[in-house]
């Protein structure tokens, strides 16, 4: 088919070849089957499997962490001892080259274990939905597998391949009972930021467990347990609490949602527990949650939120902070700090930027904001010399050099470098779309999506600090 030069001044266009990507993938699969240009041999269960590193890296975060950089260039044979089974790995390798995943009730658990090991979250979700659809309509109680799948590397390297987001799963597909001893939690350098992290990670976990109690009845779930003793005390400095999703918890998820009651989940007075679980506790252990908290209650005290005995156990050091907020029970050392904190509840923002009109509830926030206009960047990275307006931005930047990703998703295990990124990611699982377009009624998961929509569809002038306003039509 020949092509002729377009006449001068003619409008150009972009033609999309819809079959091109599938043809390229098919050609790569043919090269793999014929052993052409394959540059790595994978030993899975003693069985050698030839593949291309580029394809493995593009599909799996695990292989990306192995082959990235110069160190991966010299890896010609990769053995996975104690890793996924061959019958679970082979379908995944075919999927990488064909985009078709073959599942059956007999192979789904092995494929699920292998996908978890290889950090292929979208495949994990597909396997989970398949298992749930296969067994729940029949009313069959699926016996959990005895052995958990091998754990993949916990810290993903910076810049790992983008994972498929797909459509958000319903919340019921991401609930599970924690089983067995909790795995050791990795050190969290930002665990001191407990208030923010509690509402993102712990609220998600306990609300899921609480929904199981509300929806089900019958004998207690044998797999469900929460850490006790020293494990519970360490929960305030750990970001995971041993809830890494595995094969066992995901299989129990598919079968216990409507048949088991996860009662007696906690027996330790120092532990935060969901309100839904308090009905199964003795009267002496029940407590009312502090105002503003729908998920957690203190098991240590019997009074309302003002009980100081329980709060001192959970938050040592409050004796040096005599000023307490009556709404959320936060404690402060100075009266001025309490007055400033109250603006969080009232929504008052008395401090205004004289340049752009942005308003803030604290003078320190206004001072930090003013550096945007002045160009001042007082915080410098000692590694690369980059400078930042806020010290929080510097701390987040340093993680790029260390490769740390301290914030794990409690549902799928994906780890993130920044807390705000985790918050946005969690909405994929919950289906939450909090950003609303008033003119057309559409909802969006991320603020950037709403701003782009307003600019493209309504001609809005968007600014993160000033309320959006719709401009006149063209």
Swiss-Prot record:
Residues 162-172 have a biased composition (Basic and acidic residues). A zinc finger (C2H2-type) spans 323-345, 351-373, 379-401, 407-429, 435-458. PANTHER family: AGAP004733-PA (PTHR46105), ZINC FINGER PROTEIN 37-LIKE (PTHR46105:SF28). GO terms for cellular component: nucleus. Its main location: nucleus. It comes from Mus musculus (Mouse). Induction: Induced in activated lymphocytes. Acts as a sequence-specific transcriptional repressor in association with BCL6. Necessary for activation of naive T-cells to antigenic stimulation. May attenuate the regulatory effect of BCL6 on antigenic activation of naive CD4 T-cells by forming a heterodimer with BCL6. Ubiquitously expressed with higher expression found in heart and lung. Residues 173-183, 210-220, 240-249 have a biased composition (Polar residues). It is found in: Nucleus. This is B-cell CLL/lymphoma 6 member B protein. The keyword Zinc-finger applies. Disulfide bonds: none annotated. Residues 150-160 have a biased composition (Pro residues). SMART domains: BTB, ZnF_C2H2. PROSITE patterns: BTB, ZINC_FINGER_C2H2_1, ZINC_FINGER_C2H2_2.
């Amino acid at each position: 088919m020949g092509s002729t030069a377009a006449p001068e001044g003619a409008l150009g266009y972009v033609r999309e070849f819809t079959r091109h990507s599938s043809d390229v993938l098919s050609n790569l699969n043919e090269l793999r089957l014929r052993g052409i240009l394959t540059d790595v041999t994978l030993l899975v269960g003693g069985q050698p499997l030839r593949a291309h590193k580029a394809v493995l890296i593009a599909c799996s975060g695990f292989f990306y962490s192995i082959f990235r950089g110069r160190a991966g260039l010299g890896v010609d044979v990769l053995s996975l001892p104690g890793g996924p089974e061959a019958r679970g790995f082979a379908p995944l390798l075919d999927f990488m080259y064909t985009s078709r995943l073959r599942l059956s009730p007999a192979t789904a658990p092995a494929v699920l274990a292998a996908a978890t090991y290889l950090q292929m979250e979208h495949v994990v979700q597909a396997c989970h939905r398949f298992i749930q659809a296969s067994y729940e309509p029949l009313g069959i109680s699926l016996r959990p597998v005895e052995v958990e799948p091998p754990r993949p590397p916990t810290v993903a390297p910076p810049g790992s391949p983008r994972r498929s987001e797909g459509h958000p799963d319903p919340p019921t597909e991401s609930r599970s009972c924690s089983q067995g001893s909790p795995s050791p939690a990795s050190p969290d350098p930002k665990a001191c930021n407990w208030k923010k992290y509690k509402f993102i990670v712990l609220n998600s976990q306990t609300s899921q467990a609480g929904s199981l109690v509300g929806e089900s009845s019958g004998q207690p779930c044998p797999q469900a347990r929460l850490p006790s003793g020293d494990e519970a005390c360490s929960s305030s400095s750990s970001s995971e609490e041993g809830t890494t999703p595995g094969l066992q918890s995901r299989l129990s998820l598919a079968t216990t949602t409507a048949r088991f009651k996860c009662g007696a989940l906690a027996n330790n007075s120092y532990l935060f527990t969901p309100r839904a679980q308090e009905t199964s506790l003795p009267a002496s252990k029940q407590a009312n949650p502090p105002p503003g908290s729908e998920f957690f209650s203190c098991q240590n005290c019997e009074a309302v939120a003002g009980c100081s005995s329980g709060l001192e156990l959970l938050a040592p050091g409050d004796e040096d902070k005599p000023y307490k907020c009556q709404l959320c029970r936060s404690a402060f050392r100075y009266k001025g700090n309490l007055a400033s904190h109250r603006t969080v509840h009232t929504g008052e923002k008395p401090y205004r930027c004289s340049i752009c009109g942005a308003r803030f509830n604290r003078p320190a926030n206004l001072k930090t904001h003013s550096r945007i206009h002045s160009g001042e960047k007082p915080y410098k990275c000692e590694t690369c010399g980059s400078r930042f307006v806020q010290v929080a931005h510097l701390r987040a930047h340093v993680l790029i050099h260390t490769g740390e990703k301290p914030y794990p998703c409690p549902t799928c295990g994906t780890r993130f470098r920044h807390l705000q990124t985790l918050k946005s990611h969690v909405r994929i699982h919950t289906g939450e779309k909090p950003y609303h377009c008033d003119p057309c009624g559409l909802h969006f998961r991320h603020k950037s999506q709403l701003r782009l929509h307003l600019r493209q569809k309504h001609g809005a002038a968007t600014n993160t600090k000033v309320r959006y306003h719709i401009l006149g039509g063209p």
